Curated annotation (Swiss-Prot):
Organism: Homo sapiens
Family annotation (InterPro entries): Ribosomal_bL19 (IPR001857), Ribosomal_bL19_sf (IPR038657), Translation_prot_SH3-like_sf (IPR008991)
A GO BP entry: mitochondrial translation
Protein family: Belongs to the bacterial ribosomal protein bL19 family.
Keyword tags: Mitochondrion, Phosphoprotein, Ribonucleoprotein, Ribosomal protein, Transit peptide
Gene: MRPL19
Protein name stated in the entry: Large ribosomal subunit protein bL19m
Length: 292
């Protein structure tokens, strides 16, 4: 009987060895295979084309329907408005017709005193028959076909100013490099200011601005050279806001300049020039010219 028990024991041990050998040949279960592949090494995504890949939702576009729509900003060039007291409307009407015809050939952009412009003109004495000049607009003057503007720039330490006729046939292009306003309607005092306020790179690139955006106002105040100046800019009749008078004049000189002050002129209603009706009539002429 002992021999039978020993034979059965050895048979059971042989069967267990054969079973373990068979398990090593079989493929592992799916759960074990997943645990093996999901190790510390992270699989790289093949991109959004892979089925089931995560795609972020599009950003919502929020439209405020209660916000009032900003009206289109219209600009009427100042040379279209005749001077006060002129009583010959036919002459100005004929001039405006010629001005509108010229604007169909040459694009005259919106610009103000303080804007930086680049003007290209025909020059028979230049190598390429054209010349360019970049500078800051320091003054706009004249009415009708005689409208002019002055550009100023400091080149090699020397101040250079060129007065361009706005409707001159030699003007080929007027490019606004930087559109902005200043605190004053005339910047002729830059002639007496430090050169750094009139120095601009001739290769300056244009500054992009939205079409309906308000024109920015540059509140820069310049420092002046020591006296004498070309004019007495400190006197109230010039009404200059863009000069640091506290750095170049004493308190006694400022009090002396106030002797020429005429504060009653601010309340003189006869000096006001209402151009609303004239502007409305001119806009009708401009719209009719665009349709023709």
């Amino acid at each position: 009987m002992a021999a039978c028990i020993a034979a059965g024991h050895w048979a059971a041990m042989g069967l267990g060895r054969s079973f373990q050998a068979a398990r090593t040949l079989l493929p592992p279960p799916a759960s074990i295979a997943c645990r093996v592949h999901a190790g510390p090494v992270r699989q790289q995504s093949t991109g959004p084309s892979e089925p089931g890949a995560f795609q972020p939702p599009p950003k919502p576009v929020i439209v405020d329907k209660h916000r009032p729509v900003e009206p289109e900003r219209r600009f009427l060039s100042p040379e279209f408005i005749p001077r006060r007291g002129r009583t010959d409307p036919l002459k100005f009407q004929i001039e405006r017709k010629d001005m509108l015809e010229r604007r169909k050939v040459l694009h005259i952009p919106e610009f103000y005193v303080g804007s930086i412009l680049r003007v290209t003109t025909a020059d028979p004495y230049a190598s390429g028959k054209i010349s360019q000049f970049l500078g800051i607009c320091i003054q706009r003057s004249g009415r009708g076909l005689g409208a002019t503007f002055i550009l100023r720039n400091v080149i090699e330490g020397q101040g250079v100013e060129i007065c361009f006729e706005l409707y001159n046939p030699r003007v080929q292009e007027i490019q606004v490099v930087k559109l902005e306003k200043r605190l004053d309607d005339s910047l002729l005092y830059l002639r007496d200011a430090l050169p750094e306020y009139s120095t601009f790179d001739v290769n300056m690139k244009p500054v992009v601005q939205e079409p309906n955006q308000k024109v920015p106002v540059n509140e820069l105040k310049v420092k002046m050279k020591p006296k004498p100046w070309s004019k007495r800019w400190e006197r109230p009749n010039f009404n200059i806001k863009g000069i640091r008078f506290d750095l170049c004049l004493t308190e006694q000189q400022m009090k002396e300049a106030q002797k020429w002050n005429q504060p009653w002129l601010e309340f003189d209603m006869m000096r006001e020039y209402d151009t609303s009706k004239i502007e409305a009539a001119i806009w009708k002429e401009i719209e009719a010219s665009k349709r023709s």
